[in-house]
């Protein structure tokens, strides 16, 4: 009987260890350089963090918490979608309306593919080995065969396209239309729009995260300053919680059932998913301007990009970025 209880006790201890403690700052990783930033993405297997910065992508070794290299010649970069199974990365180059395909071993660009106007967010569908480039001002999604490196479809979306998420089991890609306050569901087999769902009481959603097991979507809504939880099968809005100002990213940790919304006002709202309920459990103070974020599900750490700014002049929202101050903030429960 004692032997039968041991695995159960060990699993309970492990689960409690994962859930215990509030998030706090663990480390700052200096990156340096000048220019703005946008999305971050993690490759847990390769232990790499990809951070868009200026006209390049900074590559960080998250095992050592140090810069390991960079990917250059990516004008107007918004982010990189890693495809670990192909050892490739797909970079949205907003200023030249292209996707740069990168060899993740050498960090060299293999080729560039034409997209729609101003590709912004991006994602990789590992089940179909396809990449979606979401063209923010182009109002469409460019679908790329990740192996062949060729465009196979363009999906008209009719709106200002923001972040997306993929449900490989349901064969759907979800994406926010910020100006329409809608969530669109795309059929990944036919590359056509299947559903358009209103997100009310949410408004102007940008960030998006997905809980595949429980069929829940988490939308960061800047217009209403809320994080909305939606049923990914029916499109029904189940819950909504208040968040900070200037949200730009969402993440979800399946092990802890925690949803995160990072905001430019220097906060991350952390909420617990329990069935149809969503409850705020922590408001984490970060740094003003740290609006984009990603999570490493293997370690439960979240990463945010930030920099130091001078005092703003009269009538301005913020001051100038101090040269060489760009960094990545690492938060965890350790």
Question: Where are these predicted regions, by residue range?
Answer:
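Positively charged n-region of N-terminal signal peptides that target proteins for export
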Residues: 1-4
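Bacterial N-terminal signal peptides
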Residues: 7-17
